């Protein structure tokens, strides 16, 4: 079958990246249709407006490009497979990454299945800044060409089979080029700002949002020396390395340096803080990760020299990875790293290739 007969369903979010993705695929000769996913049942007016506006933008783009737009409601799947897990992690004092879960459970599972089974798609496409390469009959996940926008960190749970069914047209471009194409086509999304915030929950204030689902659990804020200097409303509102929102100033006789969260004592509901962003207590020499996903589906044997990111947009850290068993690895950094956060993902790279990753179960502190 030539590309001209192959059918691609593009996940249309109402943003510029998916809009341009649809256009590029049409240019490449595919039969293109769009799909707008509704993944959250709104419970307030503001959020409803955002979702409605995004759908209207997606529809306007599809009309302009002359393609059909389907809609689907994955709110139940999102609640069961993303949101409940997200809350569980927060309750346990960890800091999960919902975008990674959402890509795993919704965009490259529910959407992929729906597109193939209900819409007869050969491929799905998204506006992610990643690339794929096919080597020896297996698809690899590569970083996006635009280093500032590369989103491979969020897609490490994909298997080579899922990548083989996915196209990422804007991954070959830099963001300014994408905006330029949208402007030349006079697409309504050309100047729309990039969405931030939790995938599908949008820009609302995170603390207020979390407070609806998890009761406040006030506790003490202690310094690394054990001095009590304040109270927190719940460990879930704080992440390692955070300095905003602690509500504490300098101590009477101490320095005026800002305070940073350096640890959470989940058992005793205590938030531990120190002054200075590079306090030794905040540094880790490595980590243990679990719930591993390797893109090539082959568990790690022995050790591996590669680089790792412990959060999005971090500079790659050279490291040595050692398999502890089939589902746990130990990672040792060449140099200590600040704010390695349990619940977040550690994602591994060999050059341009994203190998996979896992959830940080614990950090290996420089000093405890």
UniProtKB/Swiss-Prot annotation:
Q: Which residues cross the membrane?
A: none
Q: Has keyword Iron?
A: no
Question: Catalytic activity, per the record?
Answer: S-sulfanyl-L-cysteinyl-[protein] + uridine(34) in tRNA + AH2 + ATP = 2-thiouridine(34) in tRNA + L-cysteinyl-[protein] + A + AMP + diphosphate + H(+)
Q: Where in the sequence is the active site?
A: 102, 199
- Could you tell me the EC number(s) of this protein? 2.8.1.13
| Function text | Catalyzes the 2-thiolation of uridine at the wobble position (U34) of tRNA(Lys), tRNA(Glu) and tRNA(Gln), leading to the formation of s(2)U34, the first step of tRNA-mnm(5)s(2)U34 synthesis. Sulfur is provided by IscS, via a sulfur-relay system. Binds ATP and its substrate tRNAs.
Please give the subunit comment from the record.
Interacts with TusE.
Per its record, how is this protein called by name? tRNA-specific 2-thiouridylase MnmA
Source organism: Klebsiella pneumoniae subsp. pneumoniae (strain ATCC 700721 / MGH 78578)
């Amino acid at each position: 079958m030539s590309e001209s007969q192959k059918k691609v369903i593009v996940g249309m979010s109402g943003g510029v990246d998916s809009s341009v993705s649809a256009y590029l695929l049409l240019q490449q000769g595919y039969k293109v249709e769009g799909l707008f996913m509704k993944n959250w049942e709104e419970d307030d007016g503001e959020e409803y407006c955002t979702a409605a506006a995004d759908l209207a933008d997606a529809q306007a783009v599809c009309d302009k490009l002359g393609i059909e737009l389907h809609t689907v409601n994955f709110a139940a799947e999102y609640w069961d497979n993303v949101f409940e897990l997200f809350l569980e992690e927060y309750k346990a004092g960890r800091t999960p990454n919902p975008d990674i879960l959402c890509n795993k459970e919704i965009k490259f599972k529910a959407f992929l299945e729906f597109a193939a089974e209900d819409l007869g798609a050969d491929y799905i496409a998204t506006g992610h800044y990643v690339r794929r390469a096919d080597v020896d009959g297996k698809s690899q996940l590569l970083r996006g060409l635009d280093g500032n926008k590369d989103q491979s960190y969020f897609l490490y749970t994909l298997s080579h089979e899922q990548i083989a069914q996915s196209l990422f047209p804007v991954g070959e471009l830099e963001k300014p080029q994408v905006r330029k194409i949208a402007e030349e086509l006079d697409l309504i999304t050309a100047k729309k700002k990039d969405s931030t915030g939790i995938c599908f929950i949008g820009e609302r204030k995170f603390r207020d949002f979390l407070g609806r689902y998890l009761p406040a659990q006030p506790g003490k804020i202690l310094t690394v020396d054990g001095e009590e200097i304040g109270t927190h409303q719940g460990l879930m509102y704080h992440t390692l390395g955070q300095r905003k929102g602690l509500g504490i100033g300098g101590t009477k006789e101490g320095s005026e340096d800002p305070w940073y969260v350096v640890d959470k004592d989940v058992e005793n509901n205590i938030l531990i803080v120190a002054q200075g962003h590079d306090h030794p207590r905040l540094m880790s020499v490595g980590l243990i990760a679990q719930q591993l996903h390797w893109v090539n589906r082959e568990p790690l044997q022995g050790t591996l020299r590669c680089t790792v990111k412990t959060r999005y947009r971090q500079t790659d850290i050279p490291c040595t990875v050692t398999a502890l068993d089939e589902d746990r690895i130990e990672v040792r950094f060449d140099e200590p790293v600040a704010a390695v956060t349990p619940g977040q993902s550690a994602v591994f790279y060999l050059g341009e290739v994203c190998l996979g990753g896992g959830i940080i179960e614990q950090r290996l502190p420089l000093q405890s």
